[in-house]
């Protein structure tokens, strides 16, 4: 192996994709389940340069002949370069997190910063906060140690913090939807930054957005930025425009990983447009109504007849939760999916939501759609749901002409969203 990543579990890592998009060299993922495996790997030194992730960022320091002062102060190395058999250790997580904060306008000078978690990434984010002039840095733990000045989550809400950094795995795939901090009860918050990058928006970030926090951002750009700065050490040269490389690779990752969820009235064209989008983008198409039928074994009209709309909506929510946390899918949603806020959150956590807008007079009446029994029922339904579609959507796609025109409009909207 010339270049790669070592760590305990690497199944969900984006690092191979990032480095190969960035520099074109082969980059391998090398899971090392035990400490003995890691020590044997480091003793062999059969690599040019590697990244290091949990749980070996401290252990690797034992094998380094040189450790960058910043990495030594933080107590963790995530980048190792082999120079004629001598290992040189650096910490580009610091650079990646500093880039993330700067790129999104997170002001730290004079602020009170709240860091959730006490693991290794805590030290990295703390170093950035202090170096950028934070007035106070507070630590939050599920099991706080008063002697260390740590706060409970209940105490954190009353801390008066302006900035929150999450360094815990709370809300990380596949255990999404987890959040221990009540950001809605912290009216002075200016920024919430989560180092978790999968899903794109954790429950913490979604709640911060709901609470109107001016800056709420996940960790994808940090991941990319630390990789860009690691590659500079790998290759022994600087990129002409490192921030530009970060933007380019981040956009490419968003384009590859974010789901595309189509919402709108029954018969507005979600399924037809979804098939075309999936084919054009080379993605799997998931029709959520079909998944409900597969899971339940009954048709949608039969589910409505037996359990009513509430029974159907519960089954729908289960399928949206199932697929919403995955990546790289086109999701065709039922017309009423937006009626439950939990569904919208599940779609937005790792996806882009497109509202397929078709005039109510052009919608089909009857068929296998229990709530579309008449033109009047459709008009009433559209009036009730339209505000929900608009609130959920990242973009509105007019479907008043041909499907080809709607497809082109959807692609244009997606290009703008992914590159933003």
Where would I find each of the regions flagged by the language model?
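ATP-dependent small-molecule kinase phosphotransfer cores
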Residues: 290-345
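NTP-dependent small-molecule kinase module
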Residues: 244-255, 260, 276, 280, ...
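A glycine- and Lys/Arg-enriched "phosphate-lid" helix/loop adjacent to the NTP-binding pocket
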Residues: 349-388, 395
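Rossmann-like adenosine-cofactor binding region
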Residues: 148-216, 337-343
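Phosphate/diphosphate ligand-binding glycine-rich loop within oxidoreductases
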Residues: 2-104, 199-201, 205-207, 211-217, ...
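Glycine-rich adenosine-cofactor-binding loop
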Residues: 7, 89-94, 101-102, 106, ...
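Adenosine-phosphate binding glycine-rich loop
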Residues: 31, 195-258, 399
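NAD(P)-binding Rossmann-fold cofactor-contacting core
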Residues: 132-149, 289-291, 295-296
């Amino acid at each position: 192996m010339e270049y790669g990543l070592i760590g305990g579990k690497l199944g969900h890592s984006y690092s191979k994709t990032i480095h190969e998009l960035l520099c074109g060299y082969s980059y391998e993922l090398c899971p090392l389940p035990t400490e003995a495996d890691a020590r044997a790997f480091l003793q062999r030194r059969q690599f040019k340069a590697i990244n290091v992730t949990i749980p070996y960022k401290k252990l690797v320091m034992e094998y380094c002949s040189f450790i960058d002062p910043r990495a030594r102060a933080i107590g963790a190395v995530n980048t190792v370069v082999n120079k004629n058999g001598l290992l040189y250790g650096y910490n580009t997580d610091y650079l990646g997190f500093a880039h993330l904060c700067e790129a999104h306008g997170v002001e730290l000078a004079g602020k009170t910063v709240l860091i959730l978690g006490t693991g290794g990434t805590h030290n990295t984010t703390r170093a950035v906060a202090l170096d950028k002039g934070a007035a106070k840095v507070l630590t939050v733990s599920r099991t706080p140690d008063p002697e260390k000045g740590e706060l409970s989550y209940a105490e954190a809400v009353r801390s008066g913090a302006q900035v929150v950094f999450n360094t815990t795995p709370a809300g990380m795939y596949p255990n999404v939807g987890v959040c221990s901090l009540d950001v809605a009860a912290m009216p002075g918050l200016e920024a919430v930054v989560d180092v978790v990058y999968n899903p794109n928006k954790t429950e913490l970030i979604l709640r911060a957005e709901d609470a109107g926090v001016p800056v709420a951002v996940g960790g994808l750009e940090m991941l990319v930025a630390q990789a860009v700065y690691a590659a500079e050490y790998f290759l022994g040269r600087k990129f002409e425009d490192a921030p530009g490389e970060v933007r380019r690779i981040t956009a490419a990752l968003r384009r590859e990983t974010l789901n595309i969820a189509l919402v709108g009235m029954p018969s507005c064209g979600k399924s037809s447009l979804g098939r075309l989008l999936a084919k054009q983008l080379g993605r799997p198409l998931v029709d959520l109504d079909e998944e409900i039928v597969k899971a339940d074994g009954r048709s949608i009209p039969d589910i409505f007849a037996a359990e009513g709309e509430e029974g159907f909506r519960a089954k729908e929510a289960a399928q949206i939760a199932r697929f919403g946390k995955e990546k790289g899918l086109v999701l065709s949603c039922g017309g009423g999916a937006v009626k439950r806020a939990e569904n919208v959150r599940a779609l937005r956590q790792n996806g882009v939501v497109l509202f397929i807008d078709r005039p109510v007079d052009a919608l089909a009446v009857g068929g296998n759609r229990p709530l579309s029994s008449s033109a009047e029922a459709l008009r009433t339904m559209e009036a009730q749901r339209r505000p929900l579609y608009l609130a959920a959507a990242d973009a509105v796609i007019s479907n008043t002409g041909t499907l080809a025109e709607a497809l082109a409009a959807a692609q244009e909207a997606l290009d703008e969203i992914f590159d933003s």
